[in-house]
Amino acid sequence: MRIVKDIPHPRFKITVYSWNGKYIIKIEDAHLEQVYKIDEHQISGLAELDAMMSTPFLLKVLKRFSEMGEDFNDAWKNRHLKKDSNS
């Protein structure tokens, strides 16, 4: 996997990788990350990936990070509770 581009953003670290015929877009915020994959042949070039990182999309990413953080914190707080009988 090789890094092909960093997309500047004031809050997130956005890195684009190329691997196995796909672009892998990794968006990081603190200890969480989201990863999106797209076939290289589906886009005309890396500029299209820049355009995909629009404000509406990144606001949804931020919301998802918030939800992920809440889920993780809840799991962390409850880690000592009796395990589910299905585990």
Protein language model regions, located:
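N-terminal acidic leader/helix
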Residues: 2-39
